[in-house]
Amino acid sequence: TYGSWRNNFMLVSDDIDKRSDRIIQETTEDIAEDVKAEKPFLNVLKIHADSFVQETTSGGDRYSLVNKAIFDALEVGAIVVNYFGHGGENGIASERIFDIINAQELNNPTKLNCFVTVTCEYTKFDNPLRETAGEFLFWNKKGGAISLITTTRRIYVNVGINFNKTLSQYLLSYGSDETISIAEALRRTKNDPMISNQPQRRLVFSIGDPALKLPIADPDIRITKLNNEAIASTTLVLNALSPAKIEGNVTNAQGAVLNNYNGVLTATIYDKDVERSTIGNDGTKDSNNELILMDFDALGEVIFRGQASVTNGEFAFEFIVPRDITVAEGNGKISLYSKENATLLDNRGYNYNIKIGGVNLNAPEDTIGPTINLFMNDENFVSGGITNENPTLLANFYDENGINTASGIGHDITAILDGDETNVFRLNDYYTAAIDDYKRGSLSYPFRDLSPGLHTLTVKAWDVYNNSSTQDIQFIVFDKDESLELTNVLNYPNPFINYTEFWFSHNSSDVLDVSIQIFTISGKLI
């Protein structure tokens, strides 16, 4: 489907189990930086496994937080997921950061990606006796990948490095706004002078429709004003707790405003990039006996994600900058995506000229937390009702100054299931403000494989002033082993002459076909 997820690009790197793995991590980082430079409208998410804490379990070393980060990012959506590292028929990385079971559990039916795995035997489709992780990812009826560029046999690291870097150039059409099909990008990669003499190029295949292209939107969306000043010349800095008004227009590639363009814009404002580092989980050292670490820049936190109407090619939106921005002044990023109402046209844009930092010392006071309304699966749900084992949380929010998504310490939008504070669900990335109204917003979050029975879900949110509110909802996950039961059957009006309505409760989470028969007191069917 259409949506701002089409501006997202995701890379995942293996950790460093041995010294020679260092180049895998560094290559992934190099590709990420190349993508940022060549396609600055893309929001590049880096998941370097070694920047997360590794856990030791009875089954071996694991990265549960990496697994969750991959799941969440895939369900939020990305046009490409590029994994570089070790892998095999059962998944990627020896720590099983995304395994064959995960490939079947993924639930992203409207945000299908191109999954790139230059690794060993991930999609060994030529063995009918053994189904592999890549095949399950492609077959996934709830989503998965719409296309894969993947391997059927073991591939050497040096070949993988050159192949991955070369592939990115063609897949994203560096230097051009004209995209080619995914399969054509692979063909050109294999015929590139860097790769054409490598026999192992024959181990990499395209799975999917050979005519399919990446869903990259057309250029361009441009920011023209910040707080009524021209964006190109303004010296304004967006301070914490200060109001912001951003104006712009949707144009063609030549910069002409599309005066007949009417639709909806999604704007995502990022704080300054964050400096991060890997942590050397496996204690692997280089030839100088120093722990192998890698510094890298990651996207800043989202300080606002909202929507605005586009009318005759023009748009404007407002918000209050959260208290939790990093105070030091620097350039953030505005990421823009819009969809035209009457056609299949969508556009994208970006701007790095916005400066963020400092604090508005004259901000009005606010001591009231946001209002939260919770539902499960649909907004007709009443607390205590029945759901399936994979329910979707729906949450609506309201606050006079807007909801905080800037991820200050302890200030995330969170959900806690059954009081388990060791397993907190962070929901910031799922929140979007309403169209033309930064005070209202909503999110939906899919839960997976919940146990049958009664559950209590607690959602906590903060406004941009860091006032918090919590709200609970209870729901009963239907036990598939139970027989169907109907209770509280009633009708109104009763008695009736020619019309009545029936209500009843049932213990099924499925859509039901209901047959009603009405008899007279003498037993005659009406």
What are these regions (language model features)?
Residues T251, S309, W462, F519-G523:
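Hydrophobic alpha-helical segments, especially N-terminal targeting/anchoring helices
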Residues P219-I221, N362-L374, H455, L484:
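Proline-centered linker/hinge motifs at extracellular inter-domain junctions
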Residues F478-S522:
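Glycine-centered coil/turn sites that cap beta-strands in beta-rich domains
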Residues T1-Q307, T311-I320, A328-G330, S338-N360, ...:
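Cysteine-dependent hydrolase recognition
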Residues L226, S233-T235, M376, L486-N491:
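Surface-exposed, proline-enriched loop/turn segments that connect beta strands in immunoglobulin-like
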Residues T266-G358, N373-N380, N388, L394-D479:
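Long, low-complexity serine/threonine/glycine- and acidic-rich segments characteristic of extracellular
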Residues L11, A232-I269, N380-D412, P495-W503:
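Contiguous beta-strand segments within globular domains
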Residues N252-Q254, I325, D399-N401, S451, ...:
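Short, acidic/polar linear motifs in exposed loop/turn regions
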